[in-house]
Amino acid sequence: MSLEVRRTAEREIQRYHAKTGLSITALLKYAGIPHRTWREWARRRGAETKHNNNIPKSYHLTPEEVKAIIAYCVNNSLKGYRMQCWEMVDRNVAFVSCSSVYNVIKHHNLDKKWVEVKEAAKQGFEQPTAVHEQWHIDFSYIKIQNSFYYFIGILDGYSRKLLNWRLCKNMEGINAEILVAETKEMYPQAAGPRLISDNGSQFISKNFEELLALLEFSHTFTSANHPQSNGKLERFHRTLKTEHVRRSSYLEYQDACIRLAEWIAYYNSERLHSAIWYLTPNDVFYGRTAVRLAERKEKLHTAYIKRQEYWRTRNAVS
């Protein structure tokens, strides 16, 4: 309300008070003006009304933070805003919440629509509570030039770390047996993990079952025609093909092995995973979860304090 309008309202209230003898309180109630507003008008009588709508609050992002977020999101537009957020925190680009990142990219039309994935009715197996409790194994096709090869990997169900893998020229059972034996040698501390596989001929063979018995593994088969039962590894295969295979053009088999190894190293040690608090599989696998989350919390708190000081200084000057 402008000063002129406020003065007019005050004069009218005083005029009716003098003319009718009604109390100021009654006239204010009739006019719909709260008594606290009248007292505030009296306190600021003669002073122009100042609105603070345009004064940035202490929790607002600074211009430098907004610029950093925009620049990072433009260069990483294929990733979701939550992954972008925690990558920026981990890489010391900007220390803001996921909702703040979303608001910035939404305001600057940098967001993209995602297909909503409906949750399956079945929730699958009981989830592991530590590493090496559940291992997942499966094959997937990869095309190199004009030939198909077969990627087989073992994924730790708790950390989502790909423990071991091979790129095979066929789907014979010996490839699965070698991979399981190699992985057990790599991680001797794994005491009888539960191996989850589909009902492929490689996994139901007598030789494969004898190997698992020798290694003291338990074996669980997924439901027929229900790949979601092995969903963690199926999701890894999807990520592998979406983020790497379909963007690459392998020259030949050896070239594919080298580049797959590089991407898998990136997946395990750098790529943030939405199912494990947007940490890397190695963070969870090696027990760094609490430390990494605490580091992020400290960064966000420090940035919040600096942001408050920034706006306090700016608002004091203006």
Model-derived regions, located:
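Mobile-element integrase/transposase regions
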Residues: V89, A94-F95, S99-L155, K161, ...
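RNase H-like polynucleotidyl transferase catalytic core
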Residues: G192-N199, A213-K232, S248-Y253
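Residue-centric detector for conserved, function-critical "anchor" positions
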Residues: M1-I33, A42-N52, A68, N75
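Basic, flexible linker segments flanking DNA-binding modules
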Residues: R39-Q134, Y286-V291
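Generic alpha-helical secondary structure signal
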Residues: R36-T37, N207-E210, L214, G231, ...
